[in-house]
A protein has these predicted regions:
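Gram-negative outer-membrane beta-barrel transporters
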Residues: 57-72, 89-174, 202-204, 215
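Membrane-embedded beta-barrel scaffold of Gram-negative outer-membrane proteins
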Residues: 2, 11-14, 20, 40-99, ...
């Protein structure tokens, strides 16, 4: 639905009922799979808006998207950490309430240059409602942050493209109970890229340099598996 065409405002709503059969790996992967897995079923509700407009001539666009959703999931299939290895398991009943917000814009500059920027934020409360007598009842699911987001900035010239990106993830829990001893700290990772594309005769070249984790942040995505510190890489592509 588009109630105000001149403002480029779209409103949408959705309901769907989904059914997911466990994959072959979910069932039989060595030490990880579980042959007792039940199919995952969910009722999903979503409502959202998208607004887009150019506020002045140099601005190509300004876009804002907001989506809110509620998912009621039965027998949710998850990878569940155990003492020595991970196992696939069903959560009997899970409710997921979430909000996604995305903002993006771009500007045209003189001399064939442009700048684009984007940012996204996700709020997701995914709680276990399986057993009211369990110590993890109404606790956040393992490895599911309540808050996460990212941002990116790209400056493009006829000669080179410079990019900066940032990813932020809030605290998580690596076991079912949301207690301090099970907490994994949140983190922010920043990356920088420099790239150039050019053509020589009929051959296209692309060279890209990346500086990853600029701040040399030490963090875990999975408990006890630390991610690398600051690193760099160079990638070259040739197309004939």
């Amino acid at each position: 639905m588009q109630p105000w065409r001149e403002q480029m405002l779209f409103v949408r709503g959705m309901y769907k009922s989904t059914f997911r059969v466990p994959s072959f790996n979910d069932l039989y992967y060595d030490r990880l799979g579980s042959r007792t897995l039940r199919p995952e079923k969910a009722d999903e509700y979503d409502i959202g808006i998208t607004w887009s407009k150019s506020l002045f001539p140099a601005m190509d666009y300004l876009s804002l998207t907001v989506d809110g959703y509620i998912n009621n999931v039965r027998d949710k299939i998850v990878a569940f950490p155990s003492t020595y290895v991970w196992r696939m398991a069903n959560y009997g009943k899970v409710r997921i309430n979430g909000l996604d917000v995305t903002l993006a814009t771009a500007f045209s500059l003189p001399y064939d240059m442009n700048i684009s920027m984007s940012a996204a934020y996700t709020f997701q409360k995914a709680i276990d409602l399986t057993d009211p007598t369990s110590k993890s009842y109404k606790d956040q699911l393992p490895y599911t942050p309540v808050h996460s987001g990212n941002a990116a900035l790209t400056f493009k010239t006829p000669y080179v493209t410079v990019g900066y990106s940032l990813v932020g993830v809030g605290k998580r829990y690596y076991l079912a109970q949301n207690i301090p001893v099970n907490e994994i700290a949140g983190y922010v990772e920043q990356n920088l890229t420099l790239s150039r594309e050019f053509q020589f005769r009929n051959v296209n070249f692309a060279i890209r340099g990346e500086l990853i984790n600029i701040a040399d942040k030490q963090y875990d995505v999975i408990k006890y598996y630390p991610m690398p510190g600051r690193s760099w890489r160079v990638v070259a592509n040739v197309k004939f």
